[in-house]
Swiss-Prot record:
Role of this protein: One of the proteins required for the normal export of preproteins out of the cell cytoplasm. It is a molecular chaperone that binds to a subset of precursor proteins, maintaining them in a translocation-competent state. It also specifically binds to its receptor SecA.
Gene3D superfamilies: SecB-like
InterPro entries the record matches: SecB, SecB-like_sf
Descriptive protein name: Protein-export protein SecB
One biological process term in Gene Ontology: protein folding
């Protein structure tokens, strides 16, 4: 009976495991360079969202994933505000390697972090006396797939160049 429990324990160690250990704001910045004059403008902002993800290995099964967002809102040619946030998370991932690990770190973890970053951005924008900013959901799986395809195309292009030289 103890042998069965030990065998079951060994099987569980080889099973893919994922756990969120911590979510935190790593960096947050808000600028409103044209306040208070921008409040007199008719509020029809052009909102631009730039995003980036990065990750690093902390220990054997621990990874830090950082989602960086920059939101720029302009009214006409005037910048109403700029918000920059780095939303971080520590994730325990084991039993997952190769392309699956890349997908977890490049798409799944940022998908978990995004609502926290969106909430922090909305809160700081509101404290700046601007209307609520509801950022639309982001399809990190599609972004990750596009980035992977672009890397593969670049690698294929470099391989072709090496063959022609």
């Amino acid at each position: 009976m103890a042998e069965n429990q030990q065998a079951a324990g060994n099987e569980n160690q080889n099973q893919p495991q994922f756990a969120l250990q911590r979510i935190y704001v790593k960096d947050l910045s808000f600028e409103s360079p044209n306040s208070p004059l921008v409040f007199q403008e008719q509020w029809k902002p052009q909102v631009n969202l730039d995003l980036n993800t990065s990750h690093n290995k902390i220990s054997d099964n621990q990874y830090e994933v950082v989602l960086s967002l920059t939101v720029t809102a302009k009214v006409g040619e005037k910048v109403a505000y700029i918000v920059e946030i780095q939303q971080g998370g520590v994730f325990m991932i084991s039993g997952i390697e190769g392309p699956q690990l890349g997908q977890m770190l490049g798409a799944y973890c940022p998908t978990i972090l995004f609502p926290y970053a969106r909430e922090a951005i909305d809160g700081i924008v509101n404290k700046g006396s601007f209307p609520a900013l509801m950022l639309a959901p982001v399809n990190f799986d599609a972004i990750y797939a596009q980035a992977l395809k672009r890397k593969q195309e670049e690698a294929a292009g470099e391989a072709k160049e090496e063959q022609t030289h």
